[in-house]
């Protein structure tokens, strides 16, 4: 009976040590997985705006599928740990109850099965970790390429923004020049209207001056005709006056000489 108890205690200690080692390995694997995921997260972290740094749909889908697998593995490990805790609790109860030592073989069989399940789960977990690492190793170059293209697109976008600002400045300058040209055109239109108005007034005055000139020409012609008639009349008067003077001088000469002698008869 004492040997059975010693064997049970030794088996219990061995199971506890194996569980401790398994837990340490699980923690180490979990930490390694966290490091891999942290590295992936640092690479997958968006550089600019979230909508501008979205990963391709296939990469995100693969990453989410691997995350679900990891969660399932963690749940399975928790179930195994729970089973081990339950088993250890039952072993504690067995130590306190001597009647339960008869089930030592059954306990060993369960412990062996638990070890096998743990090994299988660990192997499956490591396989999935390797799959995740491979998927990440395949995804990282694509992510880097996406980041490179994003950087190129960002530079191109900045260049386009710079060109846009230059074009906007040119557009504003052109609009200001257009406004100035419109003001100048309005001023020229006003000046042209004023020049046309003054020209029209000058033409009207010129037409009036032409009419006055024609009237003056007609009046001058009439005055010229009057002058010619007056000159003709004066000439006629002068000629008549000269004739009268000559006649009077002849009469005076006759009076001075006396009566004229009668002509001699033959």
Swiss-Prot record:
Coiled coil listed as a keyword: yes
Protein localization: Nucleus; Chromosome, Centromere, Kinetochore
Any one GO CC term of the record: cytoplasm
Keyword rRNA processing: no
Distribution of this protein across tissues and organs: Expressed abundantly in brain and at lower levels in testis and kidney.
Compositionally biased spans, kind Basic and acidic residues: 105-115
Region of interest called Disordered, as start-end residue ranges on this chain: 95-115
Location of Phosphoserine modifications: 232, 265
GO biological process, one term: cell division
Domain of life: Eukaryota
Principal subcellular localisation of the protein: nucleus
Coiled-coil annotated spans: 136-237
Keyword terms: Cell cycle, Cell division, Centromere, Chromosome, Coiled coil, Kinetochore, Mitosis, Nucleus, Phosphoprotein
PANTHER family associated with the record: ZW10 INTERACTOR, ZW10 INTERACTOR ZWINT
Function per UniProt: Acts as a component of the outer kinetochore KNL1 complex that serves as a docking point for spindle assembly checkpoint components and mediates microtubule-kinetochore interactions. Kinetochores, consisting of a centromere-associated inner segment and a microtubule-contacting outer segment, play a crucial role in chromosome segregation by mediating the physical connection between centromeric DNA and spindle microtubules.
Record note on quaternary structure: Component of the KNL1 complex composed of KNL1 and ZWINT. Part of the ten-subunit outer kinetochore KMN network that includes the KNL1, MIS12 and NDC80 complexes; a bioriented kinetochore contains approximately 150 copies of the network. Interacts with the MIS12 complex subunits MIS12 DSN1, and PMF1. Interacts with the NDC80 complex subunit NDC80 during mitosis. Interacts with ZW10. Interacts with CETN3.
UniProt protein name: Outer kinetochore KNL1 complex subunit ZWINT
């Amino acid at each position: 009976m004492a040997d059975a108890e010693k064997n049970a205690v030794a088996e219990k200690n061995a199971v506890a040590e194996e569980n401790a080692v398994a837990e340490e390995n699980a923690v180490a694997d979990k930490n390694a997985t966290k490091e891999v995921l942290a590295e992936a997260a640092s690479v997958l972290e968006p550089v600019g705006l979230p909508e501008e740094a979205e990963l391709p749909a296939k990469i995100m889908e693969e990453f989410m599928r691997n995350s679900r697998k990891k969660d399932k593995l963690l749940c399975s490990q928790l179930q195994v740990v729970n089973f081990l805790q339950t088993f250890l609790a039952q072993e504690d109860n067995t130590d306190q109850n001597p009647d339960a030592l008869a089930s030592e073989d059954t306990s060993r069989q369960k412990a062996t099965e638990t070890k096998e399940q743990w090994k299988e789960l660990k192997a499956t977990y490591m396989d999935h970790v390797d799959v995740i690492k491979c998927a990440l190793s395949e995804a990282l170059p694509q992510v880097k390429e996406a980041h490179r293209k994003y950087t190129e697109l960002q530079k191109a976008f900045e260049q386009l923004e710079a060109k846009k600002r230059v074009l906007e400045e040119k557009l504003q300058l052109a609009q200001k020049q257009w406004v100035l040209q419109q003001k100048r055109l309005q001023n020229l239109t006003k000046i042209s209207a004023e020049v046309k108005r003054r020209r029209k007034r000058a033409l009207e005055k010129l037409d009036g001056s032409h009419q006055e000139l024609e009237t003056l020409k007609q009046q001058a012609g009439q005055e010229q005709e009057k002058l010619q008639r007056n000159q003709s009349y004066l000439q006629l008067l002068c000629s008549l006056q000269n004739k009268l003077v000559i006649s009077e001088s002849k009469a005076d000469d006759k009076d001075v000489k006396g009566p004229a002698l009668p002509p001699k008869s033959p």
